[in-house]
Amino acid sequence: SEWLVLGIVLGSLLPDADNLAVAVATITSSPTAGLHRTFTHSFFTVTAVIMVFQLIAVLTKRPRLGNLGLGLGIGMIMHILLDLLIWFDGVQILWPLPMWINFWEGVTPPEWFSQLMMPVEMLFFALYFAGLAALARRQGTDLGRVRGLKGWTAVQTILFLIFLVLVYTMKSGFMTIYGAVYLLSLGVATVLTIQMRQTIEAVAE
């Protein structure tokens, strides 16, 4: 099961990499429709990721790569299901087929709630980093990185508070700033996850 849990955690982050495509489209003044919650949120993509990693594992005779691929697939599915539960605009789970699944079809949340969900994502990052630090201390693993995790937890908490104010007061340009910071936060979370793999993998022992 080596790298399986690591794959699950990384896979839970992977689908939101499609925000990079949204950012590029925004910068180049191209249409952003069909870029978010489509390709990276498709069960076809999940299947392809698992199969590619299984093939690489067989060819290289490194079973842990197969475990990593399976974990990525599981994590991606978890992310997709969570998106279906907490977001109100649906997910194209069978991309490229033009079929969207929306558990909340016909339900329109209050504007203040939709706005609140954006800064809350920064809070989720903060809680994730804090959780990793607590897990490392409890297990006695990756202790040299705990201080850095505390710093990133503080950064994400501050970003949450800043965006909590800006989302309700900034009249224009909010999404550009928020999108850039979100991508940076996602990148940091990915790097820290890989760095903390000993701690994450110890969960399965």
Q: Model regions: which residues?
A:
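N-terminal membrane-targeting hydrophobic helices
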Residues: 1-205
